[in-house]
Amino acid sequence: MQAAWLLGALVVPQLLSFGHGARGPGREWEGGWGGALEEERERESQMLKNLQEALGLPTGVGNEDNLAENPEDKEVWETTETQGEEEEEEITTAPSSSPNPFPSPSPTPEDTVTYILGRLASLDAGLHQLHVRLHVLDTRVVELTQGLRQLRDAASDTRDSVQALKEVQDRAEQEHGRLEGCLKGLRLGHKCFLLSRDFETQAAAQARCKARGGSLAQPADRQQMDALSRYLRAALAPYNWPVWLGVHDRRSEGLYLFENGQRVSFFAWHRAFSLESGAQPSAATHPLSPDQPNGGVLENCVAQASDDGSWWDHDCERRLYFVCEFPF
């Protein structure tokens, strides 16, 4: 069937071209219409033979004279031609087997411009809304900043007020401690001594005395030392307790200072009993008690014995009773 198709496609154009050449003005006047037609048929027959040989078809297929003489070949030719026409119709109608009943119109330049302008208008409206929201946010930020500044000012005022109240409270506590020390303790000249029965390290005891408006006891002379010894003996009898004084050599070993930085001018160190001299010890809980101070760099703070008023050096981190001194 494909061979017959190819044969028809090749023969028809050639026939048309040969027919046109045969009917040219020169040929018509040279031999007349009869000779031209006969010559044309011979050429067509020769061409068909060449095509049949080239395609491997039996001789006589596609020849009208042979078709008239052989009915079977004519029927085959018609069947082949009919099938070829049907295939051509199928091929022609295949691309348009499902046509779109509502084809979409192609956009025009005016439509494109209108669309772009619409989008620009939408963007401009959105940008305007953003500007409005930004303005609202800026206003809110300004309000919050002002509120925060007011809160900071109020907090600063409150902090100043609290600081002032704390200072007043500290002064009140110091005045209360001073009055309590002079009312409950020992008043001696322009000083008052008050014993505390709480166990504290030397530094903590100094801090507590300072918070109440005083400091650890700093006996300035022998008279104050003897008066303080009698006060402690009466308060803690019949026991012997070491009591922190405001004396230390933390700055330099052997250089004893009061808490106010003044250098100590006299000492009342404990001395052991001497059998050779027959002297009595200053504080004799045991005849073999060592002379003080004997702690070196390990014992830099001074405590007073409550029974005889002698001084002993101790580790500053020991927790002992302490006696405070207040100005009067």
UniProtKB/Swiss-Prot annotation:
Key word Secreted present: yes
Compositional bias per record (Pro residues), positions renumbered to this chain: 98-108
Phenotype upon gene inactivation: Viable with no gross defects. Trabecular bone volume and bone mineral density is significantly reduced at two months of age, and progressively worsens with age. Bone strength is reduced and fracture healing is impaired. Hematopoiesis appears to be normal.
A Pfam family the protein falls into: Lectin_C
Location of this chain's protein in the cell: Cytoplasm; Secreted
UniProt-listed InterPro entries: C-type_lectin-like (IPR001304), C-type_lectin-like/link_sf (IPR016186), C-type_lectin_CS (IPR018378), CLec_Tetranectin-domain (IPR051663), CTDL_fold (IPR016187)
Molecular functions per Gene Ontology: carbohydrate binding; growth factor activity
Source species, domain of life: Eukaryota
Tissue expression notes: Detected in femur where it localizes to trabecular bone of the femur metaphysis, and cortical bone of the proximal femur. Also expressed in trabecular and cortical bone of vertebrae (at protein level). Strongly expressed in osteoblasts and bone marrow stromal cells. Also has very weak expression in B cell progenitors in the bone marrow and T cells in the spleen.
C-type lectin domain ranges (all copies): 188-325
Entry-linked SUPFAM superfamilies: C-type lectin-like
Principal location: cytoplasm
Cellular component terms (Gene Ontology): cytoplasm; extracellular region
SMART domains xref list: CLECT (SM00034)
First and last residue of the signal peptide: 1-21
GO biological process: ossification; positive regulation of cell population proliferation
Post-translational modification summary for this protein: O-glycosylated. Probably sulfated on the O-glycans.
Residue numbers spanned by region Disordered: 22-111
Cystine crosslinks: 209-324, 301-316
Gene3D superfamilies: Mannose-Binding Protein A, subunit A
Keyword annotations from UniProtKB, A to Z: Cytoplasm, Disulfide bond, Glycoprotein, Growth factor, Lectin, Osteogenesis, Secreted, Signal
Described function: Promotes osteogenesis by stimulating the differentiation of mesenchymal progenitors into mature osteoblasts. Important for repair and maintenance of adult bone.
Protein name in UniProt: C-type lectin domain family 11 member A
Gene that produces this protein: Clec11a
